[in-house]
Amino acid sequence: MANSLYQKHIISIPELSREELELIVETAGNIKKEPQPDLLKNKVIASCFFEASTRTRLSFETAIQRLGGSVIGFDSAGNTSLAQKGETLADSVQIIASYANAYVMRHPREGAARLASEFSNGTPVINAGDGANQHPTQTLLDLYTIYETQGRLDNLNIAFVGDLKYGRTVHSLTQALAKFNGVKFFFIAPEVLAMPDYICEELDELGIEYQLLNSMEEAIPELDILYMTRVQKERFDESEYAHIKSAYILSAADLKPARENLKVLHPLPRIDEINIDVDKTPHAYYFQQAENGVYARQALLALVLNESL
């Protein structure tokens, strides 16, 4: 298969084909089995995080260094010319991208990554999260983790639990899995945090089955993947938050009727939505999922910056 990802901007999941997603997943698995320390030799990657990040930033920078590349950039916009001197984002991108072979960016503004791609003068832009919009590289590591644990991306039953309204990770992953066959979704959330209508409408147009549920209990026996998310406290008053939060806490006891192959995933950080007793069950896979971020991002960088591997 030709590498259609070479020199491509990675802005959103809908712009990636099933074949491209499969190529990234396959490459991540190959790199995990057999490290490739020279794929980014003599390459410079700009890592520009305009808002706080721990896992994504460190995962990207680890991926770059393990492939033999060099990193330039910053982890806070506070000390940049944008903040100190009023430079526009477009000007900043144009200058920094000229120093690098690829430009990795996280920004609080929706659409910032798309804007960056228009001013990077051909340097590939990789979206590391733009507001509540898209987080494509989280989706890539999620897909790789699902494939690693289930051996397939077709014919899966997957539930998303918690904040499905604002959680960009669940939007992107739903759109990605919708490219595969026989996937059934369970969306488990309070009405105020339900999956956005546009996602459900996309699934309706594709004829993909999904259910809207209020509790995990009835779905767990059917699932291959249980994807937990954090309910964000700042969006509720204290009493409402306490009520909603308590309805979506997963314990080891809840997993007793689960299939043997069920894996529990979470984009992290978790707060109270997964009890620590789940950590010791064979279903817990969220820490391995976070580790897989390095391999998925290595695969993406390698494919974007090498015409062939």
Curated annotation (Swiss-Prot):
Biological process according to GO: 'de novo' pyrimidine nucleobase biosynthetic process; 'de novo' UMP biosynthetic process; amino acid metabolic process
MF-aspect GO terms: amino acid binding; aspartate carbamoyltransferase activity
Cellular component GO terms held in the UniProt record: cytosol
InterPro entries named in the record: Asp/Orn_carbamoyltranf_P-bd, Asp/Orn_carbamoylTrfase, Asp/Orn_carbamoylTrfase_sf, Asp_carbamoyltransf, Asp_carbamoyltransf_Asp/Orn-bd
Annotated metabolic or biological route of this protein: Pyrimidine metabolism; UMP biosynthesis via de novo pathway; (S)-dihydroorotate from bicarbonate: step 2/3
Catalyzed reaction equations: carbamoyl phosphate + L-aspartate = N-carbamoyl-L-aspartate + phosphate + H(+)
Pfam families named among the record's database cross-references: OTCace, OTCace_N
Binding annotation for L-aspartate: 85, 168, 230
Enzyme type, top EC level: transferase
Binding-site positions, carbamoyl phosphate: 55-56, 106, 135, 138, 268-269
Documented EC number(s): 2.1.3.2
Superkingdom, taxonomy of origin: Bacteria
Keywords, comma-separated and alphabetical: Pyrimidine biosynthesis, Transferase
HAMAP family named among the record's database cross-references: Asp_carb_tr
PANTHER family (alphabetical): ASPARTATE CARBAMOYLTRANSFERASE, ORNITHINE CARBAMOYLTRANSFERASE, MITOCHONDRIAL
Subunit structure: Heterododecamer (2C3:3R2) of six catalytic PyrB chains organized as two trimers (C3), and six regulatory PyrI chains organized as three dimers (R2).
Family: Belongs to the aspartate/ornithine carbamoyltransferase superfamily. ATCase family.
Role this protein plays: Catalyzes the condensation of carbamoyl phosphate and aspartate to form carbamoyl aspartate and inorganic phosphate, the committed step in the de novo pyrimidine nucleotide biosynthesis pathway.
NCBIfam families in the record: asp_carb_tr, PRK00856.1
Protein name: Aspartate carbamoyltransferase catalytic subunit
Protein source organism: Aliivibrio salmonicida (strain LFI1238) (Vibrio salmonicida (strain LFI1238))
Gene behind this protein: pyrB
